[in-house]
Curated annotation (Swiss-Prot):
Pfam families: Helicase_C, ResIII, UVR, UvrB, UvrB_inter. PANTHER family: UVRABC SYSTEM PROTEIN B. HAMAP family: UvrB (MF_00204). It comes from Lacticaseibacillus paracasei (strain ATCC 334 / BCRC 17002 / CCUG 31169 / CIP 107868 / KCTC 3260 / NRRL B-441) (Lactobacillus paracasei). This is UvrABC system protein B. Keywords: ATP-binding, Cytoplasm, DNA damage, DNA excision, DNA repair, Excision nuclease, Helicase, Hydrolase, Nucleotide-binding, SOS response.
């Protein structure tokens, strides 16, 4: 058993002081939480430094904090930023560790059973272990996570109870330690020394923790006593330092004792018997036979090996939970008084709310057709009301908060952050008639091209985007389109080429809202702005308008024959913010300047060595994949996988995620 250190302080390191609207937002939100308010909103316009505000609130409250993001890429960006702000504290990353995941499913219409298939990213698995071990060891922890944090993870009490606490001078037999390491899922391998393994050389045991990839723990025995504990470089064996005490956390989050396993097997067998009676009474003989055969095989594997493929479907029995009870998740590893901050809450909260129903629909089919026991339904993400039970303090962060947040938070508990430290204003907005819109747009594009600036155009359909691209090309304009049919890595290349000036106009649908940051864009044209719907709703329009707020000449033109309620709300909100920003700039004599953002290197189609980095090589977008031989395709995938792992190791999760998505697309083409 280990004791958690509870007196550490968050140490915010930054060359900047809060500026613009940041000081009042930080003070208001901190005071609100200290007064006992449970839910608040940080309504921050694009580019106002919301992450820095969040960091100051974390430092002020000094409580473990969970930052929720709606995808791995944005989680990776946040992780990098918080690591810079809190270099002396534990900033951790917790997302799904699957590079590829095909869930188990059954399609009755074609009688097709799809077996679970997955590939685990070892680097992300290491970071997940690092997050849970940090939460049990100390209080100054920030975990940046995706919605993976509301999926089942294993009982934190069992996980904590299985931690091995080793001290210098402790009396323990070497073989007893080896057995204990095996009990917590470490593998003995004296040759291939990796995470989650240990090796033995006489009276010396070396343990490679699951949460590390560089340092191992060397335990030296003198008889039945631990003589010395040292931290060593896992590759060279060089001693890093000596330790009086070390805690070895289990190599898996899903810890089960022998007693629990035997109890679970009995419980599974009893449920099987009951479910077989139900199926046979409904004359579902094929389903009953299938369920009996599959479940008995799983029980036998658990008896003999302590494990079976798909063991997570029996998690309710393993944990000793009652039917319908929520699973243990990452949230259970936090102490009760932790903070939650939800980034881009207008997207993240609907995602959290929708996870349960999507998972349930797929698994219900497996239960109905005899592939799984009903208890498999309890291996699931949290329902929204179960998530809410974990909330002690929660901050929703968004430029456009959603109805869920706005319904729960009084107006007085919303802190606005509108002023940008850079002085940049929200863009001017004009509404122009649809008649003659393309000719008008061509004239506006030419003005931007002459000024070496870029243009975004948003349409409603892929066909419209492609047709408009062809028309503008015929007019001599350098233009590309971007929509969901474009491969992941090609999208990154297209954005890079736009910034480099290889073309001037990018046409898209809804990919131009969150996550695309191009300071060179000074004009956004919104076609069919008066067509009410998801893509032209108030929140979507405000997010799209925000893409032009990085440039001092930012402007938005909406082409419409009437001003809809959504348009009016978006225009009024943008004008309100712009008025506040202009007044602030006047009072403080600030001149807005376009953000200067470096253009990152393209992802190449091969793994560069130190010797050939200077040589010109093809980028992935230039590779003609269709004409490659099967062997060349395999080599390309292998090279991209190496780059992905290297990017993850450097904590460049945005790059790693792009590479992962490309590998999956290429593998799908190969099959």
């Amino acid at each position: 058993m280990i004791e958690r250190i509870a007196d550490r302080k968050f140490d915010l390191v930054s060359p900047y002081q809060p500026a613009g609207d940041q000081p009042q937002a930080i003070a208001k939100l901190t005071k609100g939480f200290e007064e006992g308010k449970k839910e608040q909103i940080l309504l921050g316009a694009t580019g106002t430094g919301k992450t820095f505000t969040m960091s100051n609130i974390i430092a002020n409250l000094n409580k473990p904090t969970l930052i929720l993001s709606h995808n791995k890429t944005l989680a990776g960006q946040l992780y990098g930023e918080f690591k810079e702000f809190f270099p002396h504290n534990a900033v951790e990353y917790f997302v799904s560790y699957y590079d590829y995941y095909q869930p188990e499913a059954y399609v009755p219409s074609t009688d097709t059973y799809i077996e679970k298939d997955s590939a685990i990213n070892d680097e992300i698995d290491k970071l997940r272990h690092s997050a849970t071990s940090a939460l049990l060891e100390r209080n100054d922890v920030i975990v940046v996570a995706s919605v993976s944090s509301i999926f089942g993870l294993g009982d934190p009490h069992e996980y904590k109870n299985h931690v091995l606490s080793l001290r210098t001078g402790m009396t323990i037999d070497r073989n007893t330690l080896l057995r204990q390491l095996v009990d917590i899922q470490f593998d003995r391998n004296d040759i291939d020394f990796q995470r989650g393994r240990f090796r033995v050389r006489g009276d010396v045991v070396e343990i490679f923790p699951a949460s590390r990839d560089d340092h191992a723990i060397r335990v030296e025995f003198f008889g039945d006593e631990i003589d010395r504990i040292t931290e060593v470089d896992a590759l060279t064996g060089e001693v890093i330092g000596t330790r009086d005490h070390v805690a070895i956390f289990p190599a898996t989050h899903f810890m089960t004792s022998d007693e629990q396993m035997q109890r679970a097997i009995k419980s599974i067998a009893a449920e099987l018997e009951a479910q077989l009676k139900v199926l046979r009474s409904e004359n579902k003989l094929l389903e009953a036979q299938r369920l009996e055969q599959r479940t008995n095989y799983d029980i036998e594997m658990m008896r003999e090996m302590g494990f079976t493929s798909g063991i997570e479907n029996y998690s309710r029995h393993m944990d000793g939970r009652k039917p319908g009870e929520p699973p243990y998740t990452l949230l259970d590893f936090f102490p009760k008084d932790f903070n939650i901050m939800v980034d881009e809450s207008h997207v993240t909260m609907p995602q959290i709310r929708g996870m349960y129903n999507g998972d349930r629909a797929r698994k219900q089919m497996l239960v109905n057709y005899g592939f799984r026991l009903p208890s498999a339904l309890d291996n699931r993400p949290l329902k929204i009301n179960e998530f809410e039970q974990h909330v002690h303090r929660i901050l929703y962060v968004s430029a456009t908060p959603g109805p869920y947040e706005l319904d729960r938070v009084p107006k007085d508990d919303i802190a606005e952050q509108i002023i940008r430290p850079t002085g940049l204003l929200d863009p001017k907005i004009e509404v122009r008639p649809v008649m003659g819109q393309i000719d008008d747009l061509v004239g506006e594009i030419n003005k931007r091209v002459d000024a070496h600036e870029r243009v975004f155009i948003t349409t409603l359909t892929k066909k419209m985007a492609e047709d408009l691209t062809d028309y503008l090309k015929d007019m001599g304009i350098k233009v590309r389109y971007l929509h969901s049919d474009i491969k992941t890595l090609e999208r990154t290349q297209i954005i890079r080429d736009l910034r480099l000036g290889k073309f001037d106009v990018l046409i898209g649908i809804n990919l131009l809202r969150e996550g695309i940051d191009v300071p060179e864009v000074s004009l956004i044209a919104i076609l069919d702005a008066d067509k009410e719907g998801f893509l032209r709703a108030e929140r979507s329009l405000i997010q799209t308008i925000g893409r032009a707020s990085r440039n001092e000449h930012g402007k938005v033109i909406m082409y419409a024959d009437k001003v809809t309620d959504s348009m009016k709300a978006a225009i009024d909100e943008t004008q309100r913010r712009r008025t506040i920003q202009e007044k602030f700039n006047e009072e403080h004599h600030i001149t807005p300047k376009t953000i200067i953002k470096p253009i990152r290197a393209a992802i190449s189609s091969y793994e560069q060595s130190d010797d050939d980095k200077a040589e010109a090589k093809k980028t992935f977008a230039e590779v003609d994949y269709e004409d490659m031989s099967k062997a060349d395709k395999k080599e390309l995938v292998a090279n991209l996988r190496s780059q992905m792992q290297a990017a993850a190791k450097k904590l460049d999760f945005e790059q790693a995620a792009s590479l992962r998505d490309t590998i999956l697309e290429l593998q799908a083409d190969m099959s």
